[in-house]
Every structure is written in C-alpha cells, then in structure tokens.
UniProtKB/Swiss-Prot annotation:
Cellular localization per UniProt: Cytoplasm
CDD domains per record: p23_hB-ind1_like
One BP term from GO: RISC complex assembly
Biased composition, class Basic and acidic residues, residue ranges: 175-184
This protein's encoding gene: cPges
Annotated family: Belongs to the p23/wos2 family.
GO molecular function, one term: protein-folding chaperone binding
Name of the molecule in the record: Cytosolic Prostaglandin E synthase
Entry keyword annotation includes Kinase: no
Function: Cytosolic prostaglandin synthase that catalyzes the oxidoreduction of prostaglandin endoperoxide H2 (PGH2) to prostaglandin E2 (PGE2). Through production of PGE2 may regulate the activity of non-muscle myosin II in an autocrine or paracrine fashion; this may influence border cell and nurse cell stiffness to facilitate border cell migration during oogenesis.
Residue segments, region Disordered: 115-184
EC number(s) reported in the record: 5.3.99.3
Main location: cytoplasm
SUPFAM superfamilies: HSP20-like chaperones
C-alpha cells in the first residue's frame, strides 16, 4: 500500500469467490480515478461531504488479476469493483502482498462466501420446494378431513391440575371462599 503525502487511504473492504475478487471503497467519493493492472489496484477520490479529505490507495494483489474484465458500480455510499482472477482456483490467503495488517482494509462478510460454498455452485436446486404440496403425501387438504373432531362435544378441564396457589385455596375452602365486600 502506498499513499502520497496529505492523502489518506479510504476504508476498503474485500471479498472473494473462486474466480473473482470484490474490492469495495466504503466512502462516498467524487472526482474518482481508478486503475487496475495485473498486480495492482489504484484508487483516488475526494470525499463528497468533506472535500478537504482526499483519498488515495494502491493495493498490491497477492496474485494476478484480469484488468480487462474489471467492472465497477457506484452504489451511492460506496464503490464496488468486481475484479476477475487471472486463474480460477483456490482462495487467496490475503488480498495483498503486504505482510502487515493494513488498518483500512477489512473483510466484507456480507459478500464473502466460503470456499466450500463455491464448490456447490451458484445454482442450487431448490425447485423441489415449489411443488411441495403436489408431491406424493403432500395432499394436505384430505389429511385434515381424517380428524374426528366433534364440535358439539364440550371440552372437559376436570382433569387439568391447578396452576395457581389461589385455585388450591378455593378447593380447600381457603381465602378464595370468602366473599369480598365492595368498598363504601
């Protein structure tokens, strides 16, 4: 990472897939300049809310990327760069070649996907749930007709145990039997 004097690095987050890297500049900027080479990502911009804050950052990628296929989206409060890896393969252990932790760089767990999730692929087959009720054993309308519920029969709560102390007092002739007189 390098930055010129007077310039500060913007907050940057990143995530990866088997075949690409996401780099997100987590600040709303104007006068944006960016350049991606096979080994580096360079960003310059000015904070929209505070024009005295000028940002610049250069990231040295751990492995090579394909700069010709980079896409970017301005999402209002952040800029998202989708950067294809030169060669799809195992996940990178780090985004950069830097041996020290960069204070402005963090993982974006909202976009992050585990390596095992990538192996399953993006197209998970959830189609079986769409036809759940039409499947064998899924005729639920007829299942409820089998219940023998007699609406005319009264429920009996004679065998239900008491839950409060007052109910026990009522049964034993305790205070619950005393008639309360209204206040005059």
């Amino acid at each position: 990472m390098s930055a010129a004097a007077g310039l500060i690095p913007p907050p940057v987050s990143w995530a990866q897939r088997n075949d690409l890297i996401y780099v997100i500049i987590d600040v709303e900027c104007k006068d944006i300049e960016h350049k991606v080479t096979e080994k580096t990502f360079t960003f310059k911009g000015v904070n929209v809310l505070d024009p005295s804050k000028k940002y610049e950052v250069t990231l040295n990628f751990l492995h090579e990327v394909d700069p010709e296929k980079v896409t970017s989206k301005n999402i209002g409060r952040c800029l998202e760069f989708t950067i294809p890896k030169k060669a799809a393969g195992p996940y990178w252990s780090s985004l950069t070649t830097d041996k020290t932790k960069l204070h402005f760089l963090k993982a974006n767990f909202a976009k992050w996907r585990d390596e095992s999730d990538d192996e399953e692929g993006d197209q998970k087959d959830n189609s079986m749930f769409g036809n759940f009720l039409n499947s064998p054993g899924g005729d639920w309308n007829n299942k409820f007709d089998d219940f023998n519920v007699d609406d005319e029969e009264e429920d009996s709560d004679d065998n239900i145990p008491s839950l409060s102390q007052n109910d026990e007092d009522d049964e034993e002739g305790g205070e619950g039997d005393k008639e309360k007189k209204p206040a005059a």
